Amino acid sequence: MYRSHVTANGLEVAQKWARMSPLPETATGLHVETRGGPFTREFTIRFNAPPDDLDSWLNSSPGTSNLKPVVNGRSRVYNVEPGNGAMHAEVTVDDDTNLVVIHTYWS
């Protein structure tokens, strides 16, 4: 019970801080990593989804909808303007594996 609460809470906070819409319904392999203590908090979210669903999700999310990604080989990096008091938010998409990584933190 505690682990599922931490996962759900971390996902919710990371989505708010990165200003991202709910994950695509087709998302698989969800992994939520939480770090920090009372004065810092960091979240890293990983999941996979089909390419068309990822593009739709990125285009419908306030954090990425108007951004041009930095392309690095087969990866796209979106440097998102963080929300809800966060200091950093970034979304990376690996186009070879369809892996998405949302990384955000507050300090």
Residue ranges and their predicted role:
Residues D55-S107:
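Extracytosolic low-complexity repeat regions of secreted or lipid-anchored proteins
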